[in-house]
Design a protein with these regions (language model features):
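Preference for short coil/turn "hinge" residues that link or interrupt alpha-helices
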Residues: 21-22, 27-28, 40, 47-48, ...
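Rossmann-like dinucleotide/phosphate-binding beta-alpha-beta segment
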Residues: 1-65
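Rossmann-like dinucleotide-binding domain for NAD(H)/NADP(H)
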Residues: 66, 72-149
Length: 149
């Protein structure tokens, strides 16, 4: 994802929840700095005690009002009530989710309150195992972004 973002001219920074990722190609920052500086946050982390509800109300409060939040990792990394609040209160601009905390989406999921597709997009989670699946998906994303730009 980082290399694709760079192709679009993005300055890529990252936070490692484990501290083990030492990728020299991109600037590593702490979580607070990631939240404050990012125009777009894309989550790609395992679910563990350190990441469960990592993105809570306090995290969304620190993000830019113009920020876009994307979670393609695990649903429970995000406090869905906090995300609903952040979208309703315009604390962030928008969110796109490929995963939820509980799938299929329950009737009582707070995200159901967000009816504006400009604020929230939820897509079905697809398996990433086959290389062809990833290539097809990324090619589609690339083409869609090109159309917008």
């Amino acid at each position: 994802v980082a290399s694709h973002a760079q192709e679009f001219g993005c300055n890529v920074i990252y936070y490692s929840t484990s501290g083990k990722n030492t990728d020299q190609l991109y600037e590593r920052v702490d979580f607070e700095e990631l939240l404050k500086r990012s125009d777009l946050i894309s989550v790609h982390a395992p679910l563990n005690p350190d990441t469960r509800k990592l993105f809570d109300r306090a995290a969304f409060e620190k993000m830019k009002k113009s920020a876009i939040f994307i979670n393609v990792a695990r649903g429970a990394i995000v406090d869905q009530e906090a995300l609903t609040w952040a979208l309703q209160e315009n604390k962030i601009a928008a969110a796109a989710l490929d995963v939820l905390d509980g799938e299929p989406m329950r009737e009582d999921n707070p995200l159901r309150q967000i009816q504006d597709s400009g604020k929230l997009i939820i897509t079905p989670h697809i398996a990433w195992a086959p290389k062809e699946t990833r290539e097809r998906l990324l090619d589609g994303v690339y083409e869609n972004i090109k159309k917008i730009l």
